[in-house]
Amino acid sequence: MFIDVAKIELKAGKGGDGSVAFRREKYEPSGGPAGGDGGDGGSIIIVGDKDIKTLMDYSYRSIYKAESGGDGRNKKQFGKKGEDLILKVPVGTLVKDYDTDTVIYDVKHDKEEFVICKGGKGGKGNVHFKSSIRQAPRFAEPGEKGEEKTIKLELKLLADVGLIGLPNVGKSTLLSIMSNARPKIANYHFTTLEPNLGVCKVGEKSFVLADIPGLIEGASEGLGLGHDFLKHIERTKILVHVLDISGSEGRNPIEDFELINSELSSYNIKLNDKKMLVVLNKTDLGAEDNIKEFREKYSDKVDEIVEISAATTENVDKLMYLIADTLDSIEDDYSTLDEQYVYFEEEKEPDFKVRRENENYIVEGPLIENLIYRTNFEVYESVNHLQKVLEDKGVIQQLKDLGIQDGDNVVIGDVEFDFYE
């Protein structure tokens, strides 16, 4: 089993700013406020996709941003909503908080959606701030910031394809050509002790390929590391049996084929039910007679026979597309992950907290901090609106309960100001 991991930074779109505007009609030169609202920022949505098998696409980019909302306009026109950003991931992907490693979401189904970062709300235009005592408000709200997160995508890969065959038939070379893996390649027997895994991309599709360590006679009885090797084969969807059809090391490819198949059957008879593609490798070394003999004997007994040369890459592309098409014909099974996960659920916190620290009175909480962010301190009416909301929410009363006096320092988010009633 192999863990595919990707770290990505996410930034949802900022909400558009509300507009400060007034009606200017021909017969109404002193019309009322007409500033429209800003559009909401785009959210970032994670979607499960059964056709994606790996996290390979997230190795090329690390930062993803959704579109911001458009600003409000005159005549009460709303700004354009920012477009949501869709991130497709394989079914079975765990979405984790990067810093705490806690599970935020487990993508279990095809087309399942989860909003990982919500876009900021658009700011209200000045049309919303008209009142009996404020007929021409000259302020509007800025848009909210979008949510930001750094997450880790984690996918447990069970190899889709198992490369099997005796040592030195060219499996490691083939894996390195077909995928992003860089296995150690040496011309001696039994060198690989763990499966080398590679991710292969064919057009828009991808699959995981495992070079199963070289099997030997007696593997089904545990000789060498037989049982350890064979257990990896059980988890694959299809087998690709690689043969040195040239017999370059003095071996008979037909005898080799029968030996490996015998070991598979002895270990687990169900392995005979797996789809098997047979790859006749090293055709560049001259193997016409062996190819003819093999095809005559096995054409009607195996799913496909492909002639290739890993050394010259002849027909390797053909093999990759054949594997991808074969995998498409096999129903996916997502029941392989039976671990229990502890999910992280955010506790609902109060809208704000007020505390005293030395000579400062500190107000904390996303609702109040966002209100500060959306206040234009250059405009008296905007500041006056802020003060009214702080009173309505009970912030002013809690500050008084802590003993605040005129002239004392108040800190909300990144903003500091003196308190005066």
From Swiss-Prot:
EC number(s) reported in the record: 3.6.5.-
Task: Show the segment(s) annotated as Disordered.
Answer: 21-40
Instruction: Name the positions where Mg(2+) binds.
Output: 172, 192
Which is one Gene Ontology cellular component term of this protein? cytoplasm
Query: For GTP, which residues are the binding ones?
Result: 165-172, 190-194, 211-214, 281-284, 309-311
Q: Where is the OCT domain?
A: 344-421
Pfam families found in the cross-reference section = DUF1967, GTP1_OBG, MMR_HSR1
- Asked if the record carries the keyword Oxidoreductase, the reply is no
- PROSITE patterns tied to this protein: G_OBG, GTP1_OBG, OBG, OCT
Role according to the record: An essential GTPase which binds GTP, GDP and possibly (p)ppGpp with moderate affinity, with high nucleotide exchange rates and a fairly low GTP hydrolysis rate. Plays a role in control of the cell cycle, stress response, ribosome biogenesis and in those bacteria that undergo differentiation, in morphogenesis control.
**Whom does it interact with, and what assembly results?**
Monomer.
Protein known as: GTPase Obg
Instruction: Please name the source species.
Output: Finegoldia magna (strain ATCC 29328 / DSM 20472 / WAL 2508)
- Gene name of the record: obg
